Amino acid sequence: MPAIRRFGTLRPVLAVLLLLAKVQSIEDHFSTQPEITNHLDRSEDTMADNSSSLDAQFVSQSNSFATKLYQRISAKHAGENVVISPFSISACLSLAAMGAGGLTAEQMYSVLEFGAPDRKQTVADNYRRLMERLATDSTVNVANKIYVMQNYAVKGAFNAIATGSFRSEAESVNFAESAAAAKKINGWVEEKTNNKIKDLISPDALDELSRMVLVNAVHFKGTWTYQFDPSLTRPFPFWLSETESRDVPMMNIKKHFAFNNFEELGFSALELTYGGSDMTMMLLLPNERMGLAALEEKLPTLNLAELAGKMHKQEVEVFLPKFKIEFTRDLNEDLQALGMERMFSDSAEFPDLLEQNEPLKVSKVVHKAFIEVNEEGTEAAAATAAVVRVKRALINRLKVRLDHPFLYALMMGSSRQTAFVGRLVKPDQSDVTQANRHEEL
């Protein structure tokens, strides 16, 4: 029997790319522009506010956007494993919104749930606080980058917000040399995501009309507060339907975890924590074997922070499948369906991005995410349970079997802002041969 390897952690990784292009093809006649400024203009902001706490409304708005985007994407990928980072997508779009105007700005702020464009400074301040807080968490790496067509310059006010609130840096590239430009962008993304996200952008997405590429990359690698013992990981059935199952590597641990069975809502919730981080993973397990669709329909009415407040620490024996998910999606259609249409049209307004007075529009928004969950921890997450997977074995003793499709969310801090969200419906069968056949649980 092959030796069981003690490696890996729970690691969610994702990257979002937003590509802005020139609206129409006309002969370029701009001379070389001044270098992009790197100073932070504080004349019109409120950076003097030393508060490190996030606005509760900002968190609520962010989670609302996360829910509606997840519902849209998951509906388009029925029966598939899904993982996205609403935080990464929102951060990238929010940065672009800082340079938008007119109806374009109105639609972007509305879809992102931030209200109206007059909330611009409030949004920027909240991102500044969030980025400052995440910078102190060694398990999380958040990076933003702006790539600008050579001989073009970012406007000073936009650059001040980009560097001050989003900690983004700008770099000049020649998009006309598409292969070299794509290689540079993809190389940066790979570096920031520990080589988990590759080939985010293809060369054919870039050309001489490309003006700016905004990229957000997030990498989380957390070790469980209570690690699963690899010697207890064994093959166990995971139900794909009411009658079909497959054996998958099922991890096992018995510790005190925050838990509650919300019977009136039809699901149970379990929260796992990570050492040295305020990130947590919440697992939502339908009480019915095939109850995932019903649970997903309830998402808009669920407040994860409130759910967490109703959970109680108790001894729970947990059976959680190991899994790894990679997910890529072009978000153009999803964002337009949600109401963010104008930024993709020739009528798009982005007057505050570049010094050059040139019409710009968004040509592509791409999202790529990766997650892995094993005995040691996470690098992106997902989980599932079976028919009445949460049941009492003895008095004050719970057994939670995530052996059927379930939802999971990686959340940040006590505010429970959603960083990653997804579902597990078909765990990988890899590594099953490395585990002993599980006895009847």
Language-model features: locations:
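Short, positively charged
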Residues: 5, 60-69, 378-397, 432-434
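Extended hydrophobic
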Residues: 191, 214, 264-284, 389, ...
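Extracellular glycan-recognition regions
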Residues: 305
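Detector for small/aliphatic-rich hydrophobic stretches
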Residues: 2-176, 436-441
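Non-catalytic, conformational "gating/processing" segments within enzyme and secreted inhibitor domains
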Residues: 79, 115-289, 294, 309-394
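Catalytic and substrate-binding regions of extracellular carbohydrate-active enzymes
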Residues: 300
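Non-catalytic interaction/Regulatory regions outside core domains
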Residues: 2-3, 7-10, 21, 34-46, ...
